[in-house]
Amino acid sequence: MTNEPLDYLKRLGESGDGPHDIARAALMLAALDHPRRPVASYLSHLSEIEETMRAESAMILRVGDGARALVELLAGRLGYDGDRMDYDDARNADMMAVVDRRRGLPVALGILYMHAARAAGMLASGLNTQSHFVLRLSHRGDDLTIDPFHGGQAIDREHLPVELRPDDRGLAQPVSDTDVLLRLQNNLKMRALGAGDGERALELTRRMVLVAPSRPDLWFDLARLNEAVGVLGAARDAYEKCLDRAPSGQALHNEAAILLSQLKRRLN
């Protein structure tokens, strides 16, 4: 494989927070773990989803029509569903494996639902819920919250996550496509850290920095992980990048400055 995934993700990161071709971006992230596997068939699968939903768009008059069309295609014809048998399987956050197995985490499936919904002319955004990842669909002035992990079912108000209840509706807001991609990668990173695999966590953090190079907290995490595995020069550079991006006086800036000073004393 050429450097296409890295080049693609670098350009994506430099372009800002989106909207992006989010499903393609998720595939490119997965391709970094499968350098010998051709991406073309997976991109063709995304194109088929897009073409099918575009053909349905004229029939989508209300957001509920669109939600049903998504369910019929993704859950019905294609068989996508949440992996309730082995939720923590790392393949559930690897978009290539998700396409192969038709199983995934809420955020991975959500990316496919976002891809399909946008092809049909709807607005689709992930929501910043702390628990289960859900999507908000909007069309012609109406909106609906759906759960990709459970077959794309609509979530009525009684069963909304706490952050989305009517009396707390302002607590959960739509997030950028970059935030959704970071959430996907963070699932893998947390599993790596839980398994004590610092090298894997470091590689995943590099990818997160690639798609969101303006985020100081990611540079801080990259510095800490580099330091933990003994790559001190890279840790120093990452602390400096964090300081360049974090506003002076903020806790993150102060902590990075202290740790950088300590690291420089070790390097001298």
Feature locations, PLM:
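A structural boundary/capping signal
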Residues: 1-268
